[in-house]
Each structure stands twice: as C-alpha cells, then as structure tokens.
Amino acid sequence: MENVAIIVGAGSGERFGSYKQVEIINNKPVYQYSIDAFLDTKSFSKIIIAIPKKLINVVAEQLAEDRYKNVILCEGGVSRSQSVYNAFSMISGHQNKIFIHDAARPMINKKTILNLIEFSKKEDAVVLAKKITETVKSVKSNISNFTVDRTNLWISETPQVFNQEVLEKVYDKKLDTIHEYSDEAALAEDCGYDVIIFENKNPNIKITTKEDLSEITKRIDSDNFFGLGIDFHSLDKGDGIIVGGYKIKCDLKSVAHSDGDVLTHAIIDPLCGALNLGDIGEHFTNTKQNKNNSSIK
C-alpha cells in the first residue's frame, strides 16, 4: 500500500480577494509549504495538487526543480469536492492510502503527517481535528439564544486520510451530490463509515481572510532567526593563511591569537548572534588554552 497526497488549492479566492494559494510567505507560495511538508516525510509515492486552470503554468514554473518531480498538477473543479474528485481520478490502483489536505493550511508539518501515517494504518477513515475549548453560542439575528454543549465538539481540519476503496465506494454512491458536502469526512460519514478523530494540538490555521495570512506570516517568521557577522585580521609576513580550515600557502599570515581563520569566524559570529549567544570573542577568549587553536575544531 502506497501513500498518495492530494493538495486542494483550486479555490477562486472570491472571499480572499485573490488566489490565496499563490500568495507569498517568506519568498515561497502558500501551497508550496504543504507540498514541502509531505515531501519531507519521504513517505509519498505521488503528490497531486488541484489548482485553477489559470494558475497551472505559474505553478508548473514554480515547481520546476527536481525535488518536485513526483508532484502532478491537476485542473480543479467548480467546487472543492469536485477538485478532490478530479485529483482522485488520476490515481491508479486500488490499495492506496489517500491523504487530502487544504493548500490554504500551510502550517501543517512533517511530524504531524508522520503521526497520521502511523495512526491511520489500521483505519478506513481518519480526520485531523482540534477539540473546541472555547465557549460556543447559538446565535439568531445577532442574539445569543443559548450556550452549546462543547463536550463532543471538534473542529475538522486536514489532512484527512482514507483507504482508496472507501473513496471509490462513496463516489459511486454520492458523485452527483458531492458538492453538498463540506469535506470528504462528511461524505464518508453520510455513507456509513466511521471517521476516526486524530487530535491535533499544533497550529493549523486555514487562510480565509487577509488577517489569516498576516497571522500565519508572523508565526512562520517567528521560526526564522537572523545573525550578522564580520571578521578581519591584519596580515604579516608568514608561511600561509588559514581559510575555512585549509592553509593557503603564501608569504603572509593572519595576525591573531587563534589561527586567524576569517571565513570560519565570519560564519560562527552570525550564528552566535542569531541564537542570542553574544560575540564569538566571549566564548573564545585570548587565553593560553586557545592560543593558535584550529577554529574549525
């Protein structure tokens, strides 16, 4: 049994105001975060992304690297459910595990996917979901009628995982009405399948508004750290200069307490800065112990 991923990114962006799936976060389009997460698991034989016809050439160009050679582009449909079906129709065989994920959820990560793979091995249908912890109100005409019992309430997310034969059977029964279902888990439930909950405790925000995109950008940015470093040494007569751990033979040498390896020092210094560890000189002081030491060691 092989794992196949379907990334659903064929929305028109009507509510968002543009194609949110190709919005850029840190020099990378939104949809690509999901593809990369699935690729990083090294557990998928094929990844199919459903996208609008207008974006096929754009996405094909963005995925031209060899890393994405097993990613297949599929023209989406008029609805989310139709887009999933279009992608599903491109899958051969009958014994695959199908992972369906929204491209608008770029915060999905390798660890969660790997956990889902393991959890779903013995299940026909699994949905990633988050338990509701906040108070929920039933509202009519902007008036709160009553507080809903949240004991058994969960927020359905993606990925959702199905045995291929499950989807084949539900499509046989419901193909003409799939547009009536908000996701494939609801479709499977209506056909009598038990959809097992796999609890997600990690952020998995779905981009619906500009504010969602802004929030996700902040969260992804918070995982990035930057450091700036520089190093230089005076030169004197000698028998060579150390650069990157290698000695370049010449009639000069770096004037330094250590070996004066400017390349290694210029790399270590920004790493210390990015990790808020201070300057390289704070860790390697001018002591007898450090005299003429190799910087790469």
Q: Where are the model-predicted features located?
A:
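Conserved beta-loop-beta/alpha segment of the NTase-like Rossmann-fold superfamily
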Residues: 79-140, 157
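Active-site His/Glu-centered metal-binding helix of metallohydrolases
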Residues: 104, 263, 267, 271, ...
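Short, flexible, basic/aromatic active-site loop/helix in glycosyltransferases
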Residues: 137-160
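Terminal domain-initiation and capping elements
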Residues: 223-232, 238-240, 245-246, 250-258, ...
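Conserved N-terminal catalytic core of the sugar/cofactor nucleotidyltransferase
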Residues: 32-95, 175
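Conserved alpha/beta core of the MobA/IspD/sugar-nucleotide pyrophosphorylase nucleotidyltransferase superfamily
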Residues: 154-227
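Glycine- and Gly-Pro-enriched alpha-helical subdomains that act as flexible
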Residues: 120, 272-297
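N-terminal glycine-rich phosphate-binding loop and ensuing alpha1 helix
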Residues: 1-56
